[in-house]
Curated annotation (Swiss-Prot):
Active-site residues from the entry: 79 (proton acceptor)
Domain of life: Bacteria
Chief location category: cytoplasm
Protein name stated in the entry: Nucleoside triphosphate pyrophosphatase
Reaction catalyzed: a ribonucleoside 5'-triphosphate + H2O = a ribonucleoside 5'-phosphate + diphosphate + H(+); a 2'-deoxyribonucleoside 5'-triphosphate + H2O = a 2'-deoxyribonucleoside 5'-phosphate + diphosphate + H(+)
Subcellular location field: Cytoplasm
Keyword RNA-binding belongs to the record: no
Keywords, in A-Z order: Cytoplasm, Hydrolase, Nucleotide metabolism
NCBIfam families assigned to the protein according to its UniProt record, in alphabetical order: maf (TIGR00172)
GO biological process: nucleotide metabolic process
Alphabetical list of SUPFAM superfamilies matching this protein: ITPase-like
Chain's role: Nucleoside triphosphate pyrophosphatase. May have a dual role in cell division arrest and in preventing the incorporation of modified nucleotides into cellular nucleic acids.
Length: 209
C-alpha cells in the first residue's frame, strides 16, 4: 500500500487532509527557509519562489524517511506566502510584524500562493517529481483598532503566512476569496489530486473512509 507523507508541521494542512479523508504520516523538514530564500535569484517570479521552497522541503523529508515508508510512498511538501503590492510575505514572526502586515493589507486584495511538490518513492528511489503553485485572491476587510489588537494578542497571526487565517479568528476579517479555499489554508486539494494522478495513482487510494 502506498503511504501518504505530509512534509509539514502545519496543523492547518493536516486538518485539511484529514477532513478530506487522508490521515497522512507527518515528517517535518529541516529546511532553513530564511537561508534558502536569501540564496534565490531576487528576479524569480513569486510562484517560483514558493515552488522552490516546497520542493526543498519535500526532498528534505524524503531523505529522512524510515525504511518502512521508503518502500512505497508519496511525499508532499508545501510552502505558502502572501503576494501583495509586489512583495512576498511569509510568517511575520513577531506581534509587531503581524500588526504592520495587517495595517498594510487591510482593505486591499492579495494573493495567497502555495507551492506544492510531490515526490513518488518506490524502494527508496524517487520515481516521480511533480509540482505546481496554487494562487487564491484574498480580499481583506478592515478590522477596528481594538479588533486588530485582540487578534494580534491571540497569537494566531504571528506564525502563519501573511499573518492571517481563513479558518480561524482571521476569517472574521476576510471579505471574500476568488479561487480555492483549501489553498489559502495551506494545501490545495484539487491541485494535489492532479499531482497524484500524474504519478499514476488515484487520490481515492489514500482515503481512510
Amino acid at each position: 500500500m502506498t503511504r501518504f507523507v505530509l512534509g509539514s508541521a502545519s496543523q492547518g494542512r493536516l486538518g485539511v487532509l484529514r477532513q478530506a479523508g487522508i490521515d497522512p504520516e507527518v515528517v517535518v523538514s529541516d529546511v532553513d527557509e530564511d537561508a534558502l530564500l536569501a540564496s534565490l535569484d531576487p528576479e524569480l517570479p513569486p510562484e517560483a519562489v514558493v515552488a522552490k521552497l516546497a520542493n526543498a522541503k519535500a526532498l528534505s523529508v524524503a531523505a529522512a524517511l524510515p525504511q518502512e515508508l521508503l518502500a512505497d510512498c508519496v511525499v508532499l511538501g508545501c510552502d505558502s506566502m502572501l503576494y501583495l503590492d509586489g512583495r512576498l510575505s511569509g510568517k511575520p514572526g513577531t506581534p509587531e510584524a503581524a500588526r504592520r502586515q495587517w495595517e498594510q493589507m487591510a482593505g486591499t486584495t492579495g494573493h495567497l500562493l502555495t507551492g506544492h511538490a510531490l515526490l513518488r518513492l518506490r524502494d527508496g528511489v524517487i520515481t516521480h517529481t511533480e509540482g505546481d503553485t496554487g494562487s487564491t485572491a484574498v480580499h481583506f476587510g478592515r478590522p477596528s483598532e481594538a479588533e486588530l489588537t485582540r487578534y494580534v494578542d491571540s497569537g494566531e497571526p504571528i506564525h502563519v503566512a501573511g499573518a492571517f487565517t481563513l479558518d480561524g479568528l482571521g476569517g472574521w476579517f476576510i471579505d471574500g476569496i476568488d479561487g480555492d479555499p483549501s489553498n489559502v489554508i495551506g494545501v490545495s486539494l484539487p491541485l494535489v489530486q492532479r499531482l497524484i494522478s500524474r504519478t499514476g495513482l488515484s487520490i481515492s487510494e489514500f482515503w481512510t473512509r
